[in-house]
Amino acid sequence: MTETKKVLIFIRDYADLGEDKLFLWGDNTLTSVTAQQLVGEAAEIICHDYWLIAPRIFSSTQQLPKTVTDIEELRISSSGVKRDRESREKTDISGALQNFADSDAVKHYIDIFNKKAPIDENVLRTIGEAMLNQSSKLEADAKENNEWERFTKIERPVAEYLISSAAAGIAIDSARLRVHKENIEFDYYMALKKFSAEYNLPLELPSNDDIVHRLEPLGYDFSGVDVDYVLNFVPMNDNFAIDLLNLRKIAKSRNVLNAIPLSQKRIFPIVDCFGSITSRIYFKDPSLQNLAKHHRDILIPDDGKVFSYVDYEQYEAGIMAALSNDETLLTLYADGDLYKQVASGIFQDEERRKEAKRLFLSYAYGMKNRHLIDAAFGYGADRRLTKDFFKRFETFEKWKISVHALFETDQRIGTALGNHLRRDGAGPLTEKEKRSAVSQLVQGTASLIFKKSLIKLRQEPGVSLKVPMHDAILFEHSHDFDPRLVADVFARTMTEHFEGKITGKASLSPFR
């Protein structure tokens, strides 16, 4: 634990000519430093927008400072307010600094930071002291809200690992990239044209409002649910949802491919360690997690290395089983592929795994029993079999009710180690809030376990993290390394998190 704090103030050289300006404020002194001096600093480094300068520091020194607290990351990850995360891309540090420095000084600083004004060291001193004070306030708030331990033990070390990994870059196969770029426009246009003709819609990707306007007159209820929920979980009489989700996947992959220049032999994604209220990790610019599987072959290992891909099996279901302590759910998870067992119970056909998974997660996150049975019937299931199957989870139902009650009473819900979601309103929970409470606990726990796994993975010699997914990772290693060791790390971390209540499952899978 560091006993002192110093503020890093930087002016980024966006031309990448090596002319970044780095300053440290501490002990009432402003000092110009080099990247090498910065990484050798023993004090805790306080800054904002660390993602902008961290890759430059790593590129110059092949390491990062020992302890860095990005105060905007701390504020957003510990507030529990969903809109803080959602508005993050639209705001800068100026709003948060207003309570700690004169507004004119803040405005002047933002102009300096954005290279619209020359460096004024008096302004930097003022802002440095303001950031120190803001850091102390945020740390105190995080401790009071039981978020500090997670930030220091999980979020901060994971961020350092991911930033270092991303700064090392990922090699690109230019020939494959060229082929995919040439094909994607045609593929997207043909998929869009087919979708437009099939559903009599304009030749453009429909917005969420467009989707609501189409589906509501057909009887689909959007009260208390969002568009993604309806598309992913509510069965339809036609293939509208399936086709639209496929079109969206093509569009996302198209955006990723278009964001990578053909001249680029290596890409360096931007890391967002707290990319959602449940603390999911996202890579941006480019958003590699959005690459379609058949486009992933543009990513290649470095010379003499190979890729492996490990993912958790029935991750959410296992977490729900452990959290709820439902004996039926625990047994299903322990006995093999839970979703195949659900398919066998509902459809009497384990080959209907995909539909069974969709129905189970719809149930788990709060779909009403009547709608659930109708949905299963729409897939061809027997109503009585469906009703009887889901009646077995009595303890799980009681657990969900207890989660709802806790959210309503405490006005927030979180994991075993922070990451709370705060309520926006008051009074009885809405159906959407009930789903959000369960989702926050389950998905937040999933993120926590995943990040614990990454911390352990970093200790494995010879393994280089390349792309983290929600419940999987792409990593690079030598030919003589056994990648099953990584699967063991992931499975063991899940087992240990729940103190042996369940045995975690992770395995090697195809990345492409």
Predicted features, each with a name:
Residues 1-18, 126-289, 306, 449, ...:
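Conserved "right-hand" nucleotidyltransferase catalytic core of DNA-directed polymerases
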Residues 5-6, 18-142:
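Conserved DEDDh/DEDDy metal-dependent 3′-5′ exonuclease domain
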Residues 43-53, 311, 467, 472-477:
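Short glycine-rich phosphate-binding loop at a beta-alpha junction
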Residues 51-62, 72-84, 214-216, 313-328, ...:
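Short active-site loop/helix that positions an aromatic residue
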Residues 75, 91-97, 273-350:
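Function-dense linear segments that define catalytic or interfacial modules
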Residues 113-119, 137-145, 149, 167, ...:
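Long, amphipathic alpha-helical stalk/connector segments used for oligomerization, subunit docking
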Residues 185-204, 393-396, 480-512:
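Polymerase palm active-site segment centered on the conserved acidic dipeptide of motif C
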Residues 344-465, 506-510:
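Conserved catalytic core of nucleic-acid polymerases
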